[in-house]
UniProtKB/Swiss-Prot annotation:
Annotated PROSITE patterns: CARRIER, KS3_1, KS3_2, PKS_MFAS_DH
Region described as Product template (PT) domain: spans on this chain: 1317-1636
Cofactors named for this entry: pantetheine 4'-phosphate
UniProt cross-references to SMART domains, sorted A to Z: PKS_AT, PKS_KS, PKS_PP
Modified-residue entries (O-(pantetheine 4'-phosphoryl)serine), positions: 1756
Record function comment: Non-reducing polyketide synthase; part of the gene cluster that mediates the biosynthesis of neosartoricin B, a prenylated anthracenone that probably exhibits T-cell antiproliferative activity, suggestive of a physiological role as an immunosuppressive agent. The non-reducing polyketide synthase nscA probably synthesizes and cyclizes the decaketide backbone. The hydrolase nscB then mediates the product release through hydrolysis followed by spontaneous decarboxylation. The prenyltransferase nscD catalyzes the addition of the dimethylallyl group to the aromatic C5.
Name of this chain's protein: Non-reducing polyketide synthase nscA
Region (N-terminal hotdog fold) residue spans: 1321-1457
Gene expressing this chain: nscA
Domain Ketosynthase family 3 (KS3): 392-825
Organism: Arthroderma otae (strain ATCC MYA-4605 / CBS 113480) (Microsporum canis)
Positions of the UniProt region annotated as C-terminal hotdog fold: 1485-1631
Pfam families: Acyl_transf_1, CurL-like_PKS_C, ketoacyl-synt, Ketoacyl-synt_C, PP-binding, SAT
Length: 1796
């Protein structure tokens, strides 16, 4: 392009109209080409800057952003409905425009042609930030670098604006997007401004929330403001209401608002200190202001971004000025060229206007306007792609763990072994195999080993199965390599301080596992002796690291590698490659080897790999092969920059890692020096390292003649060449760990790496012990001259000052592979200068069993005794923020190490410690925030939090700035304590309290406290309403401040007073009335805090008289130190003014329930809160006690609920405890106590109660000052799960022949079928004879049509098949078979009779799975009936269950008989319907609207819209009628759509589950079936039906109701459900009955408890009248069974817990707060026994140790009830199957003692 043209580059504030996802995909794809190098750099920088900014977000916002490794990943996520919508949209627009700009130049291979004298940049809104990056650039490379700053500022701007704007108006509770800006066309700015001024004045809108003009041009005006205010303004003004206007897609808040933002806000967004551009960088190109149309005056980058920030936040956009500025530029510079050019990113309405103006101007002057689109290039094909080079970050090893021979079960023991020069080889232990039978040194015995030696780890079978959620059976079948991979992975992560999700690099989706494994001994030998369920997952190699990913919920890559002897180090190299490729951010890698199989010994011996004389003799002249070894090792690796950002301890740095192959070797197993040399050089070149700078090499060193000779040659040639020779001070030391611990095969490389890491840590190279006689003569003779040699004694390896030591680790595979790692020292960490002033620190310890918790506590105590200098701050940081927390917990907040030691000793010395120890509950308790009133005010409240926590400080400052913009004084001096604690004005007092409380609530949210409800006491209710989203924070501040002003103006301070009385309202009245001198005294009840704590108010003298009178009666009274008496007549003078102020304020439905002390209830709706509510709340009584009681009655709170007192001092805490004595209450601040200490104690309490706070956020402000301590590792509760190899069958098989196995059954559902509907999918068998027919069909409940029908009826958030589904299937099959026998029949009328459903069918939640069921039908014309049975089937084998889950009979009948029967009943039914209508009109029966009726249904079942056919209902106890209209859509292929059947019949379910006559709080009602179901004609959509039912108790079963449902069309009965039955079921069993299936096997025999479905409310358990013994089966869900239950093998005895045994299948996971723990003398066993006695009706004395549950009548239903009661009342989470695994009282109590 000719640079002489005058040019404008226009950056829009709108995305191009193209498919945005496609644009970003193309941009991403093009960036991979070497041609677009600068584009690639820009996108990488933008990704990095966004990662950095996201990492700085508060955790609640951070969690909204999925892990991403490119901007493309973010472009595919819809953020619009969340609080990050503006931030993401702004930054992505900036990235897109700058990316297109850079790519355009690279695509054209064009020179930078933006000449400052002839180029002007322009943009609107966010587009100016992209333009700024170009304005600061003098080359395209500069744009790539500077663009990241534009991205940073645009993201920060979006976050900041959204945060401020939510304080002006809360988002809609349902997430609906509302526009903050409307455009009005065909009007003038002055006209619109007049209308807005009038609206703002009339409504007395606060300045902050006024509606204003944000942009204007000659044809349109943009109006901005809070959405509700804009709506009100347009309704208020006829001119606006009838104008042409449209909402703009501005959903995240306000910009261009000079009344809202100040310089502080601009500085907060720009934050020049974090800029990636030098602040004094010069502005190179003119950039036009969108406000003035003139170039910004800024000369430097800092000035430019500040000016832009000012314009974006406070300036009005005037598009006409921008256009004029562009025209002026062209006019000044177009005369010489005759041409001008506008570059843009596609076109837009704004740009077309600019084109039009420019062309109109220049046409007269015969000038040419050139338009250039900078987006077109991205769609071009540039030929074959040439990729960029790979990433080259350094990598950091941050954690390691091992199980190695010689008892080296941890790193300290491993180092001790090396330091002492120990040789660990022994003969093969008997638990592996018997040398007496399997060892033959002559080699004559087939399959016998010729060497008896090896190196073995201790106790390979020991494992903590309960910790890893494995049953004893699964643990036993699982390869010890897999088990120890889990264990060492955990220990390595523990050392590394990895807490999944704590940082971006440790997000579970970004963590991968890579393990090397080269043998399957356990699967092939030990476990194969009795192959069981877990044979495949327990033995196949892929499950070794797959199990790690699954247990820890990592979704990054999972690879198991086999490269023979180098597998372990090759896995590390593959892991490093994944980090360099960006496939993961954290990797866990290692090698695994546990020897058990003599076959491998034999094979290796016969191939001459193994030494017959003992250990590996590395570099010894008598080297004769290697000695086999066990080994398990794991390391944790990250990119160096991530490790540093995460504050990790770095053990060493990986500079390079490579693997190649010895392709030119003389044989596949022979090493090749040339290949080894090539691999070393590749690694050195990768890192840019001089080989002579390497000072230590850990050799592969197997002790074979060929291997040692070749490796010594390759190492000396590369690392110690003859020339250039090493200097004397450049000694190269060599070592080989195999001489100590043998050759671990797949674990050999990881063992070598662990040794090298320890060498770095200890600054010592341990002695080499491989040379037993003399050095191998094949080793090069000139090694010493080359300054190379083995470390024959322990040799210091000091780190030279200012330099880093380099080391190499080798590992070679017998198949020819060579792997090499290059390491260097970790960066020297300069710990930030501590400004630590926290006086109290939380220290936490946890475990998954009592034994482990106690051992962990003992370990820490021992560590502290040995390390008294330990920093408490570091210890708190390590145990809280850098640990995964488990169900058994100990925690305390202490101020010094001795205090911690004392607390630990106190607990450990407590003889009742084990019995008192309780796991946390499976579900975290609910949390209610209680906001205090103004009585707790003092200067410096929250001071330490304000100083210490930037987030809290920012919240306070933002709220304070809003208050100041509203005309109120700053409260910061009150918060930070810079003003004296003296009487302050009501305005300052009340505003500071409300600001503190709102900031505290958000701080608690930052710390991970999820809020279930809020309650506010008096003034605190304003904060509660703001936090619940009812009013905005700005409106809360406005109302509180203006209310305080009204009080000051209209009330006299000191004329009234308030008195707190420790007595009830009635008691006060009675005592005062009993005395003549006090009987007439006037007072009012201001607050009913508890039923024994009342606040009264009135005239000062009269209140004083009351105080003296009550104190004379020994009643405690406290005169409150307040100048005014709120909630009394003194407030009358302000009420009208307050209500008027609140009238314009928008009130929204609360996002969380609000407990209202005024209404004494919990509020969920949008109508309860309004201006009148605030008036009443100021004047009327604060009934705090009644609000809490209502919350209890409604089930919102219970004894386990945690209450957080939010305010300056815990006043509400005492009130809550007064109502709920056992309540756990924590504080936010406390007078005369450091607020960080208060928060620390509260967080510990919450942690122990079952919440897991975001400890990382608590330590985040000072994280760089803390060090991660290397504390003792987790103490496992281990049991030996070893399957010994029995016999000599590995020898015997040499003489046996092998057979074959049959091919497994294959199920196919893809064949054509003569009958196929939405529910009946395929005929599998059909037989038709003269008068009989049989049909078998199969259906998949996961088929979309079937699944959608099921999900139309959900219970407990699970789709449950309604019996209308079985009805349609019965009618479908019935008509099909009947027509097969009677082909010419016109209509088939069917009576579906004797329906009995034994098991509920719950839709599974596993995507891609099948959930088949089989329907078997047999029709007999001689009886005109058809029997039906439904069965579950196995999804893999097709095997049908032995027993059906439902049965029914279809009778083919004459409808004439039905009409006659119903004609006799019609007048009775119509009479009852009319009577119900009359009672409803008289108010004696309830008339329910459609929404209310189905809202009542939601107590048990949630129907989809298509099922909601009832338009209205009249309900009178157990009788009801409904008007019904069926939806027109059939939604599938059916005989009779299930949603139509349900709509006309489920009235019975509503009666049972929604009537006041039913106890729906404790029970729900479900149906096991009905006697008949008939329809005279097919149901029709649009026709109005009526349903009627009257339910009644059945005399034969007190828990059962029955009734007939009549279906009427007009005045005639057209259908009937005869005797539909409903059974009453305890509500606490809801989870048991209605949970998705978890397995895919065929169900075994049904237990005596069953769940069934039918019309109305469709699922029920049925139990025998007499309890029967539970059958000996164990299912994952013994009630709801979708063909999903495993039989317990008869040979497997029930678990018998003991101190020696492992955890049974279900371990409890629960730990309530300390305040709820049982008395030590009243231990858990006695509590459980009492509960069992109560529930079974037995005496406690009958529950003896040898009594069996079968004998006691505890059947499967009772076991379910007991397990739920244990959970609900005792906090113990066990499943009912435990009653089978522990069949006697004695076994059960032993289990409880150990695990509860």
């Amino acid at each position: 392009m000719d640079p002489t043209f005058p040019r404008v580059v226009f950056f829009s504030n709108e995305f191009p109209s193209d498919d945005l996802k496609d644009l970003f995909r193309r941009l991403h794809q093009q960036s991979k080409d070497r041609r677009f190098k600068l584009l690639s750099i820009f996108l990488e920088e933008s990704t990095a800057i966004l990662k950095d900014e996201v990492a700085k977000l508060p955790r609640p916002l951070k969690e909204l952003v999925p892990p991403f490794d490119s901007v493309l990943a973010l472009a595919n996520v819809d953020f619009r409905q969340g609080p990050l919508g503006a931030a993401m949209e702004s930054s992505m627009l900036t990235i897109l425009e700058l990316g297109m700009f850079i790519g355009h130049y690279e695509a054209e291979d064009a020179e930078w042609d933006l000449v400052p004298s002839r180029t002007v940049l322009a943009g609107l809104s966010i587009g100016i930030l992209a333009a700024a990056a170009v304005a600061l650039s003098s080359s395209l490379a500069d744009v790539a670098k500077n663009g990241a700053e534009g991205v940073r500022v645009s993201f920060r701007l979006g976050v900041y604006v959204a945060d401020i704007s939510t304080k002006l108006e809360s988002p809609q509770p349902d997430g609906t997007l509302s526009s903050w800006a409307h455009v009005v066309t065909e009007t003038t700015q002055a006209g619109v401004q007049d209308e807005l001024d009038q609206f703002n004045a009339d409504t007395q809108s606060p300045e902050l929330t006024k509606v204003f003009v944000s942009a204007a041009d000659k044809t349109s005006v943009s109006v901005s403001g809070p959405p509700s205010r804009i709506k009100a303004a347009f309704q208020h003004s006829p001119a606006l209401r009838y104008s042409k206007s449209l909402p703009l897609p501005v959903y995240d808040g306000l910009c261009h608002a000079s009344h809202l933002y100040t310089q502080n806000d601009i500085d907060a967004v720009i934050n020049s200190a974090e800029s990636v551009i030098q602040p004094n960088r010069s502005v190179r190109l003119a950039l036009l202001s969108s406000q003035t149309g003139k170039p910004f005056a800024a000369r430097t980058a800092r000035e430019l971004f500040l000016e832009i920030g000012t314009e974006l936040l406070t300036g009005t956009i005037y598009l006409d000025n921008v256009t004029a500025g562009i025209v002026e530029h062209f006019q000044l510079d177009s005369e010489t060229s005759g041409k001008c050019q506008i570059d843009s990113f596609r076109t837009s309405l704004v740009l077309r206007g600019i084109y039009s103006t420019v062309e109109a101007k220049f046409t007269k002057e015969q000038q040419q306007l050139i338009r250039r689109d900078l987006v077109c290039w991205v769609h071009k094909d540039f030929g074959p792609r040439r990729p960029h080079s790979h990433a080259s970050s350094k990598l950091a090893i941050v954690g390691m763990a091992c199980r190695l021979p010689g008892g080296a079960n941890d790193l300290d023991l491993f180092w001790k072994l090396l330091e002492e020069g120990r040789d660990t080889h022994t003969t093969v232990p008997p638990d592996r195999f018997d040398l007496n039978t399997h060892y033959d040194p002559t080699g004559k015995t087939e399959n016998a080993t010729q060497t008896p030696f090896g190196n073995f780890i201790d106790r390979p079978g020991y494992f903590d199965a309960g910790f890893f959620n494995m049953s004893p059976r699964e643990a036993e079948q699982t390869d010890p390599m897999q088990r120890l991979a889990l264990v060492t992975a955990y220990e390595a992560m523990e050392m590394a301080g990895v807490v999944p999700g704590r940082t971006p690099s440790t997000h579970p989706s970004r963590i991968g596992t890579f393990y090397g494994q080269a043998s399957d001994d356990w699967r092939e030998l030990n476990a194969s002796q009795n192959i069981s369920t877990y044979a495949v997952p327990g033995g196949e190699r892929a499950f070794a690291n797959g199990r790690i990913n699954y247990f820890f919920k990592f979704s990054g890559p999972s690879f198991n590698l086999d490269t023979a002897c180098s597998s372990g180090l090759a896995a590390v190299q593959a892991a490093c490659s994944a980090l360099w490729a960006g496939e993961a951010d954290t990797v866990i890698a290692g090698g695994l080897n546990v020897i058990t199989d003599p076959d491998n010994y034999c094979g290796l011996g016969n191939a001459h790999f193994l030494s017959k004389t003992g250990q590996c003799k590395v570099w010894d002249k008598d080297a004769d092969g290697y000695c086999r070894a066990d080994g398990i090792g794991s390391v944790v690796i990250k990119r160096l920059e991530d490790a540093e950002a995460d504050n990790d301890n770095i053990l060493a740095v990986v500079l390079g890692a490579r693997t190649n192959h010895s392709a030119e070797a003389i044989s596949i197993t022979h090493p090749h020096a040339g290949a080894q040399r090539a691999n070393y050089r590749q690694v050195l070149h990768q890192a840019g390292v001089n080989p002579v700078d390497v000072s230590y090499i850990e050799l592969h060193g197997t002790g074979t003649q060929a291997g040692d000779a070749v490796e010594s040659e390759s190492v000396s040639d590369v690392f110690a060449p003859v020339t250039p020779r090493r200097r004397p001070d450049q000694r190269l030391y060599l070592g080989a760990v195999k001489s100590n611990i043998g050759h671990g095969e797949a674990a050999a490389g990881i063992a070598s790496l662990l040794k090298a890491l320890l060498v770095y840590q200890k600054n010592m190279i341990p002695m080499h012990i491989g040379i037993k006689s003399e050095i191998n003569p094949t080793i090069p003779k000139d090694l010493e001259r080359r300054n190379v040699g083995l470390a024959m004694e322990n040799t210091p390896w000091p780190r030279p000052a200012g330099k880093k030591r380099l080391a190499v680790v080798n590992s070679f595979g017998a198949h020819g592979g060579n792997t090499t790692l290059l390491l260097e020292d970790a960066p020297e960490r300069v710990k930030a200068q501590s400004t630590e002033d926290r006086i109290t620190h939380p220290v936490l310890i946890s475990a998954k069993s009592k034994k482990s918790l106690q051992a962990n506590m003992e370990s820490l105590l021992s560590y502290l005794d040995q390390h008294p200098e330990t920093s408490l701050a570091d210890l708190a940081y390590t145990t809280s923020s850098r640990r995964m927390h488990h169900s058994m917990r100990f925690g305390t907040a202490v101020s010094c190490i001795p205090a911690l030691q004392k607390a630990l000793r106190s607990q450990l010395c407590n003889p009742n410690f084990a019995s008192e120890m309780r796991p946390i509950p499976n579900e975290a308790p609910s949390v209610v925030l209680a906001f205090t009133g103004q009585g707790a005010y003092y200067s410096g409240m929250g001071r330490e939090l304000f100083i210490e926590f930037p987030y809290f400080r920012a919240q306070v400052q933002q709220l304070d700035r809003l208050a100041q913009r509203l005309g109120f004084p700053s409260v910061v001096p009150v918060i930070d304590g810079s003003i004296e604690d003296s009487p302050a004005s009501p305005i300052l007092t009340q505003l500071s309290v409300v600001i503190l409380e709102i900031a505290l609530a958000r701080f608690w949210s930052l710390l991970g406290v999820s809020i279930s409800a809020v309650i506010g006491h008096s003034l605190g209710e304003y904060a509660a309403l703001a936090v619940a989203g009812v009013i905005s924070a700005a409106d809360a501040l406005y109302l509180v401040g203006r209310r305080a002003q009204l009080v000051e103006e209209r009330c006299t301070p000191g004329s009234h007073s308030m008195l707190s009385v420790r007595a009830s309202e009635d008691a006060i009245q009675e005592m005062l009335a009993s005395e003549p001198e006090t009987a007439a005294i006037a007072y009012e009840v201001s607050c009913c805090n508890t039923y024994q704590d009342t606040v009264i108010g009135g005239l000062k003298d009269e209140i004083n008289n009351i105080r003296m009178a009550l104190e004379a009666k020994s009643i405690k009274c406290t005169l409150l130190d307040v100048p005014y008496a709120f909630h009394t007549a003194q407030m009358d003078s302000i009420l009208d003014g307050l209500e008027a102020l609140a009238m314009p304020v928008p009130f929204k439905a609360p996002s969380i329930p609000v407990l209202s002390p005024l209404l004494a209830t919990a509020v969920f709706d949008v109508k309860s809160f309004n201006a009148n509510y605030l008036r009443r709340a100021t004047r009327e009584t604060v009934d705090f006690a009644a609000a809490i009681e209502a919350a209890q009655d409604m089930g919102l709170v219970d004894t386990k609920t945690i209450w957080v007192d939010v305010g300056p001092h815990p006043i509400c805490a005492g009130l809550v405890r007064g109502m709920i004595p056992s309540a756990s209450v924590v504080s936010s601040c406390r007078r005369n106590e450091d607020s960080i200490a208060t928060i620390s104690k509260s967080l510990v309490t919450l942690h122990l109660a079952g919440l897991t706070p975001f400890w990382a956020e608590f330590f985040r402000p000072r994280e760089c000052e803390y060090s991660l301590l290397h504390l003792p590792k987790y103490r496992w509760n281990e049991t030996d799960y070893w399957i010994p190899y029995i016999g000599t069958w590995t020898l015997d098989k040499a003489h046996l022949k092998h057979g074959t196995k049959p091919t497994p059954f294959s199920l196919s559902m893809s064949r054509p079928s003569a009958l196929r509907t939405s529910l009946v999918h395929q005929i599998t068998a059909e037989t038709v004879e003269a008068t009989t027919a049989t049909l078998h069909t199969i259906s998949d409940m996961q088929h979309p049509d079937f699944l959608e029908a099921i999900h139309g009826h959900t219970m407990n958030k699970c789709g449950v098949a309604t019996s209308s589904i079985w009805s349609d299937m019965a009618f479908t099959v019935g008509e099909y078979l009947y027509r097969r026998l009677v082909p010419n029949v016109k209509d088939v009328h069917m009576n579906l009779a004797d329906v009995e459903v034994l098991h509920a069918q719950v839709a599974g939640k596993t995507k891609g799975s099948v959930q088949p069921l089989v329907l078997q039908a047999h029709l007999d014309l001689s009886t005109n009936s058809m029997s039906l049975a439904w069965f579950n089937a196995d999804g893999e084998t097709g095997e049908c269950a032995a027993e059906s889950f439902a049965t029914a009979t279809v009778r083919f009948e004459d409808p004439v008989a039905w009409k006659k029967e119903w004609a006799r009943l019609t007048h009775l039914v119509r009479g009852r319907i009319e009577a119900l209508e009359q009672r409803a009109a008289e108010g004696k029966a309830s008339r329910l609207s459609k929404p209310l009726a189905y809202a009542l249904f939601k107590n048990v079942v949630d129907y989809a819209d298509r099922y909601r056919g009832m338009d209205s209902v009249v309900l009178d106890e157990l009788e009801a009628m409904a008007e019904v209209t069926l939806v027109p859509e059939r939604h599938g292929t059916w005989h009779t759509p299930p949603h139509w059947i349900d709509s006309v019949s489920h009235l019975a379910g509503l009666v049972m589950n929604g009537s006041d006559a039913s106890n729906t709080r404790d029970y729900f009602f479900v149906t096991p079936g009905c006697d008949s179901f008939r329809l005279l004609n097919k149901l029709e959509p649009g026709v109005r039906y009526r349903s009627y039912v009257r339910m009644f108790p059945l005399p034969e079963d007190p828990n059962m109701h029955g009734g007939d449902v009549y279906i009427l069309q007009g005045e005639e009965i057209v259908g009937m459900v005869g005797m539909i039955r409903f059974r009453r079921v305890p509500r606490l069993l809801m989870d048991r009955f209605f949970s998705p299936p978890t397995t895919t096997s065929v169900a075994g025999p049904a237990p005596p408890v069953a769940a069934a479905t039918a019309k109305g409310h469709n699922v029920i358990p049925t139990t025998p009248a007499v309890p029967t013994p539970a059958p000996a089966i164990a299912t994952s869900n013994p009630i709801v069974n979708s063909a999903i239950a495993y039989k317990t093998p008869e040979s497997t005895p029930p678990l018998a817990p003991s101190s020696e045994s492992s955890t049974p299948k279900e371990s409890p996971i629960a730990t309530p707060p300390e305040s709820e723990r049982a008395d030590p003398m009243d231990n858990m066993v006695s509590q459980c026994l009492r509960l069992m006695a109560r529930e079974t009706g037995l005496e406690v004395e009958a529950l003896t140790g040898d009594a069996s549950f079968v004998q006691l009548g505890v059947d499967s239903l009772m076991s379910l009830v007991l397990s739920e009661k244990f959970r609900a009342e005792l906090g113990v989470e066990i499943k009912s199957s435990l009653f089978l695994e522990c069949p006697t009282i004695g076994e059960m109590t032993a289990w409880i003692e150990e695990y509860c």
